[in-house]
Amino acid sequence: MRKILKLKIGRDELVFETGFMAKQANGSVLATYGGSSVLATVCCSNNVREDLDFVPLSVEYNEKYYAAGKIPGGFIKREGKPKDKEILVSRLIDRPMRPLFDKRFGREIQVIPTTLATDQLNPPDIVGMNAAFTAVFLSDIPFNGPIAAVRMVYLNGKFIVNPSFEEIHDSDLDIVVAGSLNGITMVEGGANEVSEDILLSAIDSAHEYIKQICNAQKEFLDIVGEKEKLPLAFEEKIFEFKEELRDFIYADLKEACFVKGKLNRDKAITLLRNKSYEHFSSLEKLDDSNESLFYKAFDDFEKEIVRNSILNDKIRTDGRTPNEIRDILAEVDILSRTHGSSLFTRGETQALAVTTLGTSIDEQIMDDIDGDKRLNFMLHYNFPPFSVGETGRLMTGRREIGHGHLAQRALESMIPGKNDFPYTIRVVSEILESNGSSSMATVCAGSMSLMSAGVPVKRQVAGIAMGLISEGDKYVVLSDILGEEDHLGDMDFKVAGTENGITGFQMDIKIENVTKQLMRDALEQARVGRIHILSIMNSVISNSRVGISKYAPKIIQLQIDIDKISLVIGSTGKTVKAITDEFEVKVQIEQNGKIILFGDDDFKMQKAKEKIESIVREPKVGEIYEGTVKKINSFGAFIELTPTKEGFLSTRLKSRDSKYGSGRFGHGNRYSRFGSGGDNIRGNAGLVRPPKLEEGQRIKVRIVDIDKFGKIDLEIVRDKDY
């Protein structure tokens, strides 16, 4: 039976419906906000696996073109592989939800939110998140919900919940916040150099709306009726010889955890793990039935040692104090033929960033249900397996897309507008080494690479990854975390920004008791670390290069009247194609009359500009043109001044001392065909005729008269006349 629940959030009602669509799924909910609707389903496998030590969850958010009344572009008229946007939204749904599933469930879980309608006003991603969370909460799958999500923006000094696309575009802060009744679990977004206080206030405001949605989900569960939960696949077991294992390894493991260098530390721990395995196997206390429990117990001891050292002794595995940042080395211009490059090394994490400048033809075209877009700034993040000393496939996964998007958002508020810098900008980050915080190393390397390329960015942007170790009311905030601290810690949050404020933010919280004061302390510690990193980056390069690389395409811009655009294009594009071929340039013509020329040769580009200016320029008496003889008849020749203008050169005899503007004489009214003789005819001294002309010949002429109908009369210009 169809069940409906409504609540007011922001400008519109958020509507949940269930019991009438996708009824064979373990859970299904249709969520609608304004005119945007998303159907979310959740299903689990019937196969139970007891050997899983993780949650086998997959989230596949997808958008249908029919939702916006569109048919997919391109040759194939069917939705294809997931777009980057769909992958990013899938990650937004996955991250806050994954920790709330019980690992003992032992079955694969798949959540599929599908956008069925969009009103082009309300972004469907937030609708999809709440549809997915509610579908799982109402299902028979064990889940520690409810959770909910909202988007908050800061616009004109006010916070707006679930804003429109236009409000998002105009805002200074745009974040997506997910959480439960007890606290925040995830935050992600970008900003235009906002303060830490504004970010905290936005998160606080978001949590109030999140609690409303969570309470509505509980009310909806009462209306629908709670399903009997599926049983857990296994009870949590512990290694029965755990205390013996502690006695055997603890002292050696404590020493191994603090070996300097990631590879050396991993090697020492692995040797000790293998030694322990062989020891307990020889005692016949280890077999296939408890092997996984042995490894879990070993990992628990490692986690206990590291966390206790940080909480009690304030010493991390690499010897640093909690707020200490690893050694940093920054370089620029390390690649000779690229348009801009930088190498940023922080401890054992290293990012090589390369900036390439292109033309508007190189823009990324986004065929999206929210409307077609053209992106002139892109950042691509690559994480090859050698960066962690491993082998593997070279491919772009969801993690790479997510990290690249975070770094791109952190930098894009510093990118100049198209009017100021009409280039397409692509930054590629190659992670050459990784031991934590590679996405923030990408921000730092990318910022310096942009300056190296001569992109007039406003300021340097630096990023830092922060962590948290807590126990009860006791906590320690960590600056510039290692990979293992990310894994063993209670919170992972990344902050990017300038010396003036925050530009990018991502946070995932694994515990519920994160207080506002804790977050304030963490953000302040991140700010101090960010300023330190910026000081090192600015000592290497603090301002963008003056001018771009000689290997980058050159650009010239000019503005013409809108009604002259057709003159530049010409019939069936004939004129603009001729300019392109003659001067070896690319010509972009915009609807507002702006013309952008792209090319590699400054001289040819300048000539192309002059050509266009001559095409759109209104002719004036006295101006000199180098024209082409198009046609000759008995009375004179038609001279093409520009592809859109012609003048007439009469065969009438001209006076040597005539002045342009008179055009005709009262005497010497004699005509002759071209090529009939010399300059002087029958003693008429001072009278001249044009030299012999041929069609296609180039000749310098001066405008001597323009009548009221626009007819242009010309005279020949000799070298001694100008």
UniProtKB/Swiss-Prot annotation:
Entry GO CC: cytosol
PROSITE patterns: KH_TYPE_1 (PS50084), S1 (PS50126)
UniProt-annotated binding residues for Mg(2+): 486, 492
Record EC number: 2.7.7.8
Reactions catalysed according to its record: RNA(n+1) + phosphate = RNA(n) + a ribonucleoside 5'-diphosphate
Matches recorded under SUPFAM superfamilies: Eukaryotic type KH-domain (KH-domain type I) (SSF54791), Nucleic acid-binding proteins (SSF50249), Ribonuclease PH domain 2-like (SSF55666), Ribosomal protein S5 domain 2-like (SSF54211)
Domain annotation S1 motif: ranges: 622-717
Pfam families: KH_1, PNPase, RNase_PH, RNase_PH_C, S1
Any Gene Ontology biological process: RNA processing
A GO MF label: magnesium ion binding
Domain KH, chain residue ranges per copy: 553-612
Family membership noted in the UniProt record: Belongs to the polyribonucleotide nucleotidyltransferase family.
PANTHER family reported for this sequence: POLYRIBONUCLEOTIDE NUCLEOTIDYLTRANSFERASE, POLYRIBONUCLEOTIDE NUCLEOTIDYLTRANSFERASE 1, MITOCHONDRIAL
Protein name from the UniProt record: Polyribonucleotide nucleotidyltransferase
